[in-house]
Amino acid sequence: MARLNRPSIFIYGGSIKPSKENTDYVTVSEKVGEFSKGSINENELIHYEKISVEGPGSCGGMYTANTMASAIEALGMSLPGSSSQDAISDSKNNDCKNAGVAIMNLLDKDIKPSDIMTKEAFENAITVVIALGGSTNAVLHLLAMAHSIGCLLYTSDAADECSC
């Protein structure tokens, strides 16, 4: 989006819904370790994978995907509230429809990523990542995004945002 600098909007696919079994990706990771040690067999591992990852969507925690969705929303490149929706939800369906209306507005007014992705917008995104306790990968992604749009953003800018 930044490199092309054409009116555009980011639509996040959404997060996975919680498991009905009170298990998640962390459970699967733990079970992979148990399988590696020989504590459980392959069938048990597959069972935990099936009950822990029941449908589409990104990892349910504040890992890279959810962190970046939140940062991109704070940056102004996605619709408000769109980073916190489940992948399979009426809200996500509505978000997709609303994105169509929004992109038509951006096209009509010729609003480009360079008009939105300013230094201040990146600082706002960094602040949101820090407030959410998001993935440290966000620093690398935000630096790359800023570079793509020609915005001078440095790792020290992230440090400045969290100094009190």
Where are these regions (language model features)?
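Single conserved hydrophobic/aromatic residue that forms the stacking wall/gate
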Residues: 154-164
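Active-site cavity-forming subdomains of large catalytic enzyme subunits
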Residues: 1-124, 128-129, 142
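Alpha-helical support elements that line or immediately flank enzyme active sites
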Residues: 140-151
